[in-house]
Amino acid sequence: QASTDEIKIGVILGFTGPIESLTTTMASSAELAMKEVSDSGLLLGGASVSSVRADSTCVDAGAATSAAERLVTSDNVAAIMGADCSGVTTAIANNVAVPNGVTIISPSATSPALTDIDDKGYFFRTAPSDARQGQVLAQVVMDRGISELAVTYTNNDYGKGLSDSFVNAFKAMGGTVTAEVPHEDGKGDYSAEVSTLSASGATEVAVLGYVDQGGRGIIQSSMETGAFSRFILADGMIGDSLIENVDGDLTGTFGTLPGSESEGANMFKAMASSNGIPGDGPFEPESYDAAALIMLAIQAGNSADRSSIANNVMGVANAPGTEIFPGELGKALEILKDGGEVNYQGATNVEFSDVGEASGSYKELEIGNGEFNTIQVR
């Protein structure tokens, strides 16, 4: 049992690897929720919450499993906020979290395959499954009058799951996919992949990869050879580092990212920006919510015991109860202390399915004037 004067929560994200530019503010967003709870003095009668960071690497399942094992055995964390990428999240859930009875809430692992893992009630995610993102992105593409394209995806659980979902949805809407080309992350040269994509005859390409490695490499190589001039992106490609690091004009490039412009999203953005976090960056709201749910579950069960946390996540996430928004965690702790119920809405309108997944909405984004702009929420 975790000590009740200081409760540790693991934050395992890819601080190195193909989405490293996104993870620092994801972690800071989770830690913002922890600070809010610690400062309130209301968790289990005054416990403080501290974050223990660990590196998932995003792509190396062995390294991620070892890092998670250290969190659970040496650091004795009460629960885990993470991981980020789907393959390492699956490995951590199956190899470490579930066998040890540790609740794990991912803010960004979106592979449809995670819906079906035998998680014994310990795995949750505040980002929606890519089964839905594939459909939304296909609709966005169709609505823009694009009926033919090539697809490249990062060759892992995330990329394959999203590509299947997107391609099937696009074809069902009458679209034509001229090529599906997997790519590996961490390569120095992507000209072969770009040449295959281009040779398929498509003038548009969907890049379902990672913003700091393979996906960006595909885009850079496409710009250099003139193969493609704008790109269709999914969530793993959305980030300011793309605009900063690609040599060329990305105006008109568009894509999807889980998110909304709801009351909760705006409240989180205001709170985050006063703490030096953008607040509407990729998976920042989902990270705040994931950490918040862990702490509310601790309070609801009146215990930082690992098994108690898992049993209480659903109860605080869904109706019935008082709706709770970002910045209102103290209020939620007070209600739970008095035996009341909360329905945590948070920054992302949290509502879990019976397997602990967010349904979620998506922002359609487009690059213009050197930044990502929200076109609409779907």
Regions found by a protein language model. Name each.
Residues Q1-R378:
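Extracytosolic ligand-binding ectodomains
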